UniProtKB/Swiss-Prot annotation:
Protein name: Epimerase family protein SA0724
Protein family (similarity comment): Belongs to the NAD(P)-dependent epimerase/dehydratase family. SDR39U1 subfamily.
Coiled-coil region: none
Pfam families: DUF1731, Epimerase
Xref: SUPFAM superfamilies: NAD(P)-binding Rossmann-fold domains (SSF51735)
Origin: domain of life: Bacteria
């Protein structure tokens, strides 16, 4: 039986990942910030907001999956920016300190990250070979998060970093936010409309995570995005078609930056990111193009 330790296991990605892992011979320990009782013999919860939580984590953990982190979908006040950073750094460091104090390190760590690692660009295509230093707040979060995760290599753990693109899901996240203006017939171009959206269907994301965990040759950063990214204007048009709604309005960049503040970088300052490394290992995307993904997710 394989032992998993998961942070962020009750979130959008984590909950679906847990349901998939349960299909195998496994036991899953989920770290949460509140007391929770499990009715499933394959799952146990540990409240790591309480002192002594370390002693409740099983000794024989094989796989650590670190998805913990405050949501980006809130206005980035100075206080919340600190929360965004610390929620990722402190949780990763706590996991490292836990296993550093033990004689048995996990075989593999899968640590979430984001395509915000790469600088915004309208023309460049980014693969995993591109390396950079932080250039804005979001890239600094990503850079620090990855750096803290890489400490696990000192313990002999194989470290896999998944740079998530825009996750498309019916359970929340970006797609539900993007659907709202179209629902009320006010969807359209955002800014220039030329910025890239490097997206991924959540089912492909879950399968990619498990593929990388189980592939012993996989290590380092992986772009977890669909093979065919789209520019925002075409993305919006495709979404409108799937919802049988118009795509006719325009929200200027200046207006969006005034309304959203620094959070506007998530929709305006984006990158074209390609999943070359995971494809080279043989991973096959089920939803490689946007039309196919949206038709699966949207039943209007």
């Amino acid at each position: 039986m394989k032992q998993y330790l998961i942070t962020g296991g009750t979130g959008m990605v984590g909950s679906q990942l847990v349901n998939e892992i349960k299909k195998s011979d496994s036991h899953i320990t989920i770290l949460t910030r509140h007391d929770q009782i499990s009715n499933d013999k394959k799952i146990s919860y540990v409240n790591w907001a309480k002192s002594g939580w370390e002693h409740k984590v099983p000794q024989n953990i094989d796989v650590v999956i670190n998805l913990a982190g405050a949501t980006l979908n809130k206005r980035w006040t100075p206080e919340y920016k600190q929360t965004l950073m610390l929620s990722r750094i402190q949780s990763t460091q706590a996991l490292y300190e836990l296993f550093k104090s033990r004689n048995k390190a996990p075989k593999v760590l899968f640590n979430a990250s984001a395509t915000g690692y790469y600088p915004p660009d309208l023309f460049m295509s980014y693969t995993e070979v591109y390396k950079t230093l932080p250039f804005d707040f979001l890239s600094d979060i990503v850079y620090q998060w990855e750096r803290f995760a890489q400490q696990f290599e000192q313990l002999g753990t194989r470290v896999v970093i998944g740079r998530f693109g825009m996750i498309l899901s019916n359970e929340g996240g970006a797609l539900q936010t993007m659907k709202l203006p179209y629902k009320y017939y006010i969807g359209g171009k955002l800014g220039s409309g030329q910025q890239w959206y490097s997206w991924i269907h959540i089912n492909d994301l879950i399968q990619a995570i498990l593929f990388l965990i189980n592939n012993e040759s996989a290590s380092g950063p992986f772009n977890l995005t669909a093979p065919i990214p789209e520019r925002q204007n075409l993305f919006g048009y495709t979404l409108a078609r799937a919802m049988h709604k118009p795509h006719e309005t325009w929200a200027p960049s200046l207006a969006m930056r005034l309304i959203l503040g620094q959070m506007s970088t998530v929709v305006l300052d984006t990158q074209k990111v390609l999943p070359n490394k995971i494809q080279a290992l043989g991973f096959q995307f089920k939803y490689s193009n946007l039309k196919m993904a949206l038709e699966d997710l949207i039943k209007e």
